[in-house]
Amino acid sequence: MDIIGGQHLRQMWDDLADVYGHKTALICESSSGVVNRYSYLELNQEINRTANLFYTLGIRKGDKVALHLDNCPEFIFCWFGLAKIGAIMVPINARLLREESTWILQNSQACLLVTSAQFYPMYQQIQQEDASQLRHICLTDMVLPADDGVSSFTQLKNQQPATLCYAPPLSTDDTAEILFTSGTTSRPKGVVITHYNLRFAGYYSAWQCALRDDDVYLTVMPAFHIDCQCTAAMAAFSAGATFVLVEKYSARAFWGQVQKYRATITECIPMMIRTLMVQPLSANDQQHRLREVMFYLNLSEQEKDAFCERFSVRLLTSYGMTETIVGIIGDRPGDKRRWPSIGRAGFCYEAEIRDDHNRPLPAGELGEICIKGVPGKTIFKEYFLNPKATAKVLEADGWLHTGDTGYRDEEGFFYFVDRRCNMIKRGGENVSCVELENIIATHPKIQDIVVVGIKDSIRDEAIKAFVVLNEGETLSEEEFFCFCEQNMAKFKVPSYLEIRKDLPRNCSGKIIRKNLK
């Protein structure tokens, strides 16, 4: 069954411009308070100009273009401008540092980068010292360095016509995006997302929260994340609604933004809920039009009840990951909700709990949450240039192994228990323990290292490092944290350090992590 009617992203935007015309499509608010608004017609024209910009710079169908940007209109222009000419977006987490960004550039085969002056010095260094296929950089800022191979995105875009100059044949099976996500290994994997995936995500997420064209969907989630793209942006645009993209989350500003834009839908992670709850009580706490707050793991029942009562909202639970594209298990429109259940399988999906031998388990028994979808349509297509990793999680018949532990009840409600893999959930970011351990292990004074997540009242989990030093060495906390800050993104830096004589291991030599939590 073809849910999207064979419609790729170029057709989608041309149709949206025709149908909704001067209706507001996109509102972007920067951290400095600058607000940009675009109608569906204007946004489609900006997307076309951006597509023409890329074509002028030599980008053709199948080429990869990296984006290292905070939330801004240019991200939206690039995302769909690239899709219109069959090129592929590679979004980079805006908080990553040089080594991590270099690795993604190299492994995605990106030949062009769009970024801002804030991140340019890092990429200038990458171009000079690291091997990559990067041949040009576009800066979204008006003031440019006097460097070769650097252009002004805005100036080039404004020189382009508002009609598309290059329209190669497109298929819904074509790749639209490669989104690198942290995994259980030390390196992120490139999740291949097709035009069909994105179109389906729009219809599915709009169905999940019963989105209408008079809705206003506000998000503070970063545009380089699947949540912002597929749960928020694609849903809003597919429904002809208004999408409000705020540059960065601020607990102090959030409810004011919800009220200012008359938002009817938003999305939250636990860190947001906890920081909102510690804000001073206000008479305006319930002065909003929100009917749904899309919510992602994990929150206690007490926290949930307190938040819902104070702000007069209800949470719509949704469970998924980058590989599932959308929240494949969740609360459904018109269906009962059963907290702390993560909901039931959505349309076009099957869900099971399986044991270690890949056999389905009955209700009430713990096992791995597994999802059945159609690769390249309702779930991701594959990991980019990584067939081994793909085969490890995705069976030939479309069953996806999430690596998460849970159970279901007799009525088909699923319950999330824990992450099977060594991942730390920190304020909405997934952090790989193995990745951090490999970085910290390069410190000359450290002999052995293990990283674990410990409970944190605000950010879900804090990161704690246990280290064993080389004989005769001493290591101060200042030296350790300084080393971490220089070698990993800020959100990955451990909060705690404990120096030990040894680490607990089993008979196979593997570290027993549970003994350290």
Curated annotation (Swiss-Prot):
One of its GO terms (biological process) is carnitine metabolic process. Pathway: Amine and polyamine metabolism; carnitine metabolism. It comes from the Bacteria. GO terms for molecular function: carnitine-CoA ligase activity; crotonobetaine-CoA ligase activity; medium-chain fatty acid-CoA ligase activity. Keywords: Ligase. Gene3D superfamilies: 3.30.300.30, N-terminal domain of ligase-like. The keyword Ligase applies. InterPro entries: AMP-bd_C (IPR025110), AMP-bd_C_sf (IPR045851), AMP-binding_CS (IPR020845), AMP-dep_synth/lig_dom (IPR000873), ANL_N_sf (IPR042099), CaiC (IPR023456). HAMAP family: CaiC. This is Crotonobetaine/carnitine--CoA ligase. It comes from Escherichia coli O6:H1 (strain CFT073 / ATCC 700928 / UPEC). The gene is caiC.
